């Protein structure tokens, strides 16, 4: 093996953090390389560790350790990059209580009723009031697995660079799903003036909700591409520049002075029939307010394997994390009932 373990861990972290579609060069050591070059180097190095069954059996604990260290370092950073605009993300040691300290502003003390929505047992979401200035986010184990066919492995058609990529993507999507579930679960707890449902996009309804959220600070709109594409003012108000922006981007990135943040969308499975994020919801959240989503990572990632009867292997990964939402009466929700999560 040309690289020692610490160098291989660094390489794996660099590859896992990189954007495969970007043309930029990434630093490794004292040189810069393209993503394709780094990824191919990682594949070559891992083949030297597990290119045959005997090598895999000899080195699997080293491989698992590399995967664990990579996930522990890269996953929180990826989550931060994607969700930091509306989520607070912290990492805790195993056994430490994930505690988030709440910033209580004068207006919050005067007007904001605070409560927390978290995941309960059997997927039931519980709502309870927040006492004091801290909240604890309970964590639980989230798992992902990548199956490696024994013959595919021996033939070299599957390698551990693929395994790492599949696991990272799966854990990231699991977090995204939990965020969406937690946000959806808060809607029933909001007061009636802070939420509205329409069959389509109604400009006056959105303006009313923005006015409520803006009384606590300039608000930002968070929604999927599908929802953003419907947010078009009355025809008489559309300028040529807005038409060009809509044509080029598919949506307007600014609605009457308020930024529109488009959330990533994907499908639950390969059938492409059910979306991960329900596109009918838009969340209007004041900038500078407490970020409503709290994400806690606890302890180290654990990687192990399970051998099936056909000798195929499942590389299983467990990571403890928790997602909760802190809801105040400065958050508003618009539901466009014309949009559905199913196709």
What kind of feature is each model-predicted range?
Residues 1-56, 340-343:
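N-terminal alpha-helical "arm" segments
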Residues 73, 77-78, 82, 225-227, ...:
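Short, flexible beta-strand-to-coil junctions
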Residues 53-57, 61, 65, 150-161:
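Short, charged/polar micro-motifs that form catalytic or ligand-binding hotspots
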Residues 185-256:
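Extended, solvent-exposed, turn-rich assembly/linker loops in the middle of proteins
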Residues 141-216:
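Alpha-helical scaffold segments that mediate packing/assembly in large oligomeric complexes
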Residues 2, 43-54, 237-343:
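Sequence/fold signature of self-assembling virion shell proteins
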Residues 57-142:
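Assembly/oligomerization interface modules of large self-assembling protein complexes
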Residues 14-21, 48-52, 56, 69, ...:
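Surface-exposed polar/charged interaction patches
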